[in-house]
Amino acid sequence: MLANDRTDNTLYFEGFKKIALERGAHYKIVDMNALDELRESMSFETENVIIPMSPSEKVFSKLVKTLDNMERTDSVKITMFGQSNWQQFMGKYKGAFQKYNCTFFSKFLYDPLDEEIASFQLNFKRRFGREQYQSYPMYGVMGYDLGMYFLNAYNQFGKDYADYLSEFESRFMQTPLYFERKNKDGGLVNNRVMFVKFGTNGTVEKKIY
């Protein structure tokens, strides 16, 4: 189900419709201002994948409230699929993320509860006397990931390291990196994307492509 709130997200909206048509998947567009349609559209036989067209917290909260108020939701299999900025409020709605098997895609994942990131935050504050500027992604962590990536590549391949980046991967805290050159005259592009999935049993699964 595509939950449309009439925001200007045409490419995202049309992209999912195209994929559904190509794969022969059944879908229904539900107006966010008429969420009774959501209840009526639920299947008790197959998994219901709900894709809000807007990535906003307001839309997410509205959907969760509607799902929570539905009868017999325990017997309905639901997955919600969103965009990268869901991580900005995933801590606030952790219970809902787990209950509804929330999955989102992103080029990065900032998890302040991750031990390595928590240690980086402490070291940053000790060195610079202040907290990192709050943003998504966190630019201090991104700078560390990029610095370690290119320094390790240089250490392994020497001055011609840029010719070998398609063969090289490095550990990361926030941003997975894998650079490829689109053509001989072009620059390098990071082609990594991450899918983050919350399970009803409290697990968080990260898959990188």
Where are these regions (language model features)?
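Extracytosolic ligand-binding ectodomains
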Residues: M1-Y209
